[in-house]
């Protein structure tokens, strides 16, 4: 499936790695990054509206959708640092050395890392429904870990997680599509089928992405924390109000990383770009204004 009116390219971003990207519109560039267990199609509504006056680039992340899925060899292939470098290379290859960056879920973690590693490239940053990796692990422990069991499952050494998920991939990925949504009609059957097909074919790389978040991504965040590195661009964060339910202050956690922060909560479910596209589009436009 494709976003209507957008053209598609496979763009090489690293040795042996190309990303599938939907591109539409003209104007100042915005890159939109999807999360788990989805593809660039999550942006079909938001991208169409933004493309009226922006160049909009919607890639499948490394390891997801129709993008390449390199084998993990040394623990870095799916680090957020590597995945962020992919996005900077993608934008540059398309003629955009600077751009606004929006990420949801896993894509927001890639966007967060891009903001820290490439502050001269990212003009504005929007993160949807995540906490920074270090804060995520601190917040989702103890009884809170029950709602995030997949983080712990996919953090295990290679072998068992992949085997368990591959044994019933549709059941595994459907569980999260059902659990995290408030308006099931926001993901029509054909879009859901596209997500399941793409995820079914990407079990190993999806697990590698999550495993990196329990290892090398934590190391990188700790290094930035120790060095006092922060996001230097304007940042907007939209989240469900998980903090009040699970006992953490999401706005305060984000403020520690983003001095120029606009934080808000939404009544939409996790898949807010599909459940509340007008709200998310307005958040993006307000930050860019």
Where are these regions (language model features)?
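A short, Lys/Arg-enriched amphipathic alpha-helix followed by its capping loop at the start of a domain
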Residues: 45-54, 93
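Conserved hydrophobic "DFG−1" position in protein kinase catalytic cores
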Residues: 21-23
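Flexible "cap/lid" subdomain of the alpha/beta-hydrolase fold that forms the substrate-access gate
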Residues: 2-10, 15, 19, 29, ...
């Amino acid at each position: 499936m494709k976003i209507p009116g957008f053209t598609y390219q496979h763009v090489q971003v690293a040795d042996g790695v190309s990303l599938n990207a939907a591109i539409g519109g003209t104007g100042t560039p915005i890159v939109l990054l999807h999360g788990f267990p989805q593809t660039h199609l999550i942006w079909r509504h938001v991208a169409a509206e933004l493309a009226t006056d922006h160049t909009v680039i919607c890639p499948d992340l490394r390891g997801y959708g129709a993008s390449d899925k390199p084998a993990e060899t040394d623990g870095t292939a799916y680090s957020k640092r590597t995945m962020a470098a992919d996005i900077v290379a993608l934008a540059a290859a398309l003629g955009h050395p600077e751009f606004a960056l929006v990420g949801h879920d896993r894509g927001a973690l890639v966007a967060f890392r891009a903001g820290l590693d490439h502050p001269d490239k990212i003009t504005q940053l929007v993160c949807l429904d995540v906490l920074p990796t270090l804060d995520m692990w601190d917040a989702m422990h103890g009884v809170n870990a029950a709602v995030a069991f997949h983080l712990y499952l996919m953090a295990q050494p290679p072998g068992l997680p992949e085997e368990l998920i591959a044994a019933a991939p549709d059941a595994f990925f459907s569980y999260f599509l059902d659990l995290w949504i408030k308006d099931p009609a926001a993901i029509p059957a054909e879009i859901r089928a596209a997500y399941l097909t793409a995820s079914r074919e990407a079990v190993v790389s999806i697990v590698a992405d999550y495993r990196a978040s329990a290892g090398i991504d934590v190391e990188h965040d700790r290094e930035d924390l120790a060095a006092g590195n922060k996001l230097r661009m304007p940042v907007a964060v939209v989240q469900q109000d998980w903090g009040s339910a699970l006992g953490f202050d999401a706005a305060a956690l984000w403020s520690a990383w983003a001095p120029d922060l606009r934080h808000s909560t939404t009544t939409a479910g996790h898949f807010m770009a599909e459940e509340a596209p007008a709200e998310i589009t307005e958040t993006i436009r307000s930050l860019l204004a």
